[in-house]
């Protein structure tokens, strides 16, 4: 039986096959953040010299990419990318996701928005029927912490400060347990509209286009309906 780490590697390898299909001297690949994304980055090293470069969603991923000799570009200098590859903390059959366990949710949303296709890579344990067992990360401007926490509580959530953590943008994270996420796009908009919220870790208004889920029997591929 494959371990979870081996399943993550399987998912990363499947995404590298998609990179092989689009690789070229003018191609830029968007790269996410997290343990599965790290494995993708390590595999991407074999494309050194075959890509124009990469765009990273965090300082952590940028450092790992640079360590492999891959060019890391400023998103402001990039007009489009064929694919953005990232993991997920949870993903449902509609390819809506909860992300942000690594705290890079805002930059992940920004980089993903520039890519033509969002490729989610994960092991099968991340697939759920309904989002919400994983606490929802919310990036918050520090001065608004208590006001935002009250707003999240009114939505039925139980927000907790992620102690000792500061995002790459200089903000804090509230991890929100207990939310009922029957309408992920609607809840994403509602939370994002709370003054002081930078963004929440729901990726539903713009979810994944393709999910590559590693199972004991190989890769299960899901594509966004419609």
UniProtKB/Swiss-Prot annotation:
EC number(s) per entry: 5.3.1.6
GO molecular function: ribose-5-phosphate isomerase activity
Root EC class: isomerase
Alphabetized UniProt keyword annotations: Isomerase
InterPro entries according to UniProt: NagB/RpiA_transferase-like, Ribose5P_isomerase_typA_subgr, Ribose5P_isomerase_type_A
Active site per UniProt: 108
GO cellular component labels: cytosol
NCBIfam families per the UniProt record, alphabetical: PRK00702.1, rpiA
Oligomeric and partner information: Homodimer.
Family: Belongs to the ribose 5-phosphate isomerase family.
Entry protein name: Ribose-5-phosphate isomerase A
Gene: rpiA
């Amino acid at each position: 039986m494959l371990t979870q780490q081996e399943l993550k590697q399987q998912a990363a390898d499947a995404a590298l096959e998609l990179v092989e299909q689009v690789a070229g001297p003018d191609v830029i690949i968007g790269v996410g953040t997290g343990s599965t994304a790290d494995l993708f980055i390590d595999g991407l090293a074999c494309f050194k010299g075959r890509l124009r470069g990469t765009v990273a969603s965090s300082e952590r991923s940028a450092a790992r990419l640079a360590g492999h000799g891959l060019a890391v570009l400023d998103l402001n200098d990039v007009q489009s990318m064929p694919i953005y590859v990232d993991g997920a903390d949870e993903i449902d059959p509609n390819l809506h996701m909860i992300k942000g366990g690594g705290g890079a949710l805002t930059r992940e949303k920004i980089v993903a928005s520039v890519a033509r296709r969002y490729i989610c890579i994960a092991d099968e344990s991340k697939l759920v029927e309904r989002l919400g067992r994983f606490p929802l990360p919310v990036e918050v401007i520090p001065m608004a912490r208590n006001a935002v926490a009250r707003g999240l509580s009114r939505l039925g959530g139980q927000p907790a400060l992620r102690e000792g953590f500061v995002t790459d943008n200089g903000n804090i994270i509230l991890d929100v347990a207990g939310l009922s996420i029957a309408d992920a796009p609607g809840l994403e908009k509602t939370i994002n509209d709370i003054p002081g919220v930078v963004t929440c870790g729901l990726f539903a208004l713009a979810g994944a286009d393709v999910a590559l889920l590693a199972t004991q029997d190989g890769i299960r591929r899901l594509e966004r309906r419609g």
